[in-house]
Design a protein with these regions (language model features):
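N-terminal secretory targeting modules
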Residues: 1-37, 44, 48, 52, ...
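Catalytic His-Asp segment of secreted/periplasmic serine-dependent ester chemistry enzymes
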Residues: 2, 135-208
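Oxyanion-hole/transition-state-stabilizing segment in secreted/luminal serine hydrolases
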Residues: 44-60, 69-107, 127, 131-135
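A short helix->loop->beta-strand "cap" motif at the edges of active sites that frequently abuts
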Residues: 121-125
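Extracellular glycan-modifying ectodomains
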Residues: 95, 111, 115-116, 120, ...
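Conserved beta-strand elements of the Class I
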Residues: 37-39, 60
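Charged helix-capping and loop-helix junction motifs
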Residues: 104-113, 143-148
Length: 208
């Protein structure tokens, strides 16, 4: 009865189907422990060659589209802890802001998730990729930048943690958007955008 009840609760959580697909994949071939888990929203989910790009680091892509920091925290056991990673790389928060969360609320959600990760994975490195600025979400840029700044300041005070400023790297010399980096929706990235991400993220990844 307990197992049935727990399953029913899980099925009522947002993104159950996406998480279940990951679990089905793992049942066929479970990733080795001590890898690097990438968790977050669609910018990771749509990075289809992420695991191949970072193959030598034993990367595990657990991005699920449309997710917020609260969702990542809700599924922390199934999408992060189960893999016993040596490092966790987070890209999340953008959807929180787009859904109406303030910079302070987004920051608080990040701290909750970070604290949960740290409590369960005391030796793991935790790395946060800053929220990007995209043309389709220009109205949220101030909130995103404030949340990014708060997260950066927080992580500078934490041990074994990093902040990667991806937002600035995706702007032109005048601080404007670079539409050529984005798909037609002006939100999700083309390969050129992911090339920037690869260049900026790689130095922060830990080898075994």
């Amino acid at each position: 009865m307990v197992l049935i009840s727990m399953s029913a609760v899980a099925q009522n959580k947002p993104f159950y189907n996406e998480v279940h697909e990951f679990q089905k994949k793992d049942s066929i071939s479970m990733p080795a422990s001590n890898g690097i888990v990438f968790i977050g929203s669609s910018s990771l989910r749509m990075w289809t060659d992420l695991e191949e790009t970072f193959k030598s680091y034993h990367a595990i892509n657990r991005g699920f589209g449309g997710s917020e920091l609260t969702n990542a925290n809700d599924w922390i056991k199934e999408l992060v802890l189960v893999y016993k990673p040596r490092q966790v790389v987070i890209y999340s928060g953008e959807n929180d802001v787009a859904s109406g969360a303030s910079s302070a609320q987004t920051f608080d959600r990040f701290v909750t998730f970070f604290s949960n990760l740290r409590r369960n994975l005391p030796k793991a490195k935790i790395t946060y990729i800053s929220m990007k600025l995209s043309p389709s979400r220009a109205q949220f840029s101030d909130v995103i930048l404030k949340a990014n700044a708060s997260i950066k300041e927080y992580l500078l005070k934490q041990k074994n943690a990093d902040y990667i400023d991806i937002a600035a790297k995706m702007l032109d010399s005048k601080g404007g958007y670079r539409p050529e980096l984005f798909q037609d929706d002006m939100l999700h990235m083309k390969p050129a955008g992911y090339e920037i991400w690869t260049k900026e993220i790689t130095p922060y990844l830990t080898k075994k």
